[in-house]
Amino acid sequence: ELVWVGQAYNLLLAGGSGTGKTYIAAGLVHEAVKAGYRAYMVTLEDLLTCLKTRDVSRHAMKTYKRIMKAQLLAIDNATLFPLKREDIMLLFKLVNEFQEKTSLIVTANYSLTE
């Protein structure tokens, strides 16, 4: 069941490379769309590019609008590369805008003990 999407709960999928995190996230996004939710999946790198270029790129603005309308956003590969301060601030602002209205799935390449 996808009750958690309607309640704007978040999900962290953490583990080593090749453990199926992206597969699970994509499956949940697919099931959410089938259930009538607006859902979108994006890599962290593509999300940051979109946030940085939405004012100068028509494609980025279209993607940004789709992301902002999503009831579920899956962000893949969140720990694949180090983030700059500017990137962290953009993500913090986005997460704040989503609070209590959009569910997030984040995949991360580390174990919970790290």
Where would I find each of the regions flagged by the language model?
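Pre-Walker A adenine-sensing motif
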Residues: 1-4
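Walker A/P-loop nucleotide-binding motif
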Residues: 8-24
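Residue-level preference for the first positions of well-ordered beta-strands
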Residues: 10-12, 72, 103
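Aromatic/hydrophobic pocket-lining residues that form π-stacking "cages" and hydrophobic walls in ligand
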Residues: 25-28, 94
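Post-Walker A helix-loop "phosphate-sensing" segment adjacent to the P-loop in P-loop NTPases
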Residues: 29-42
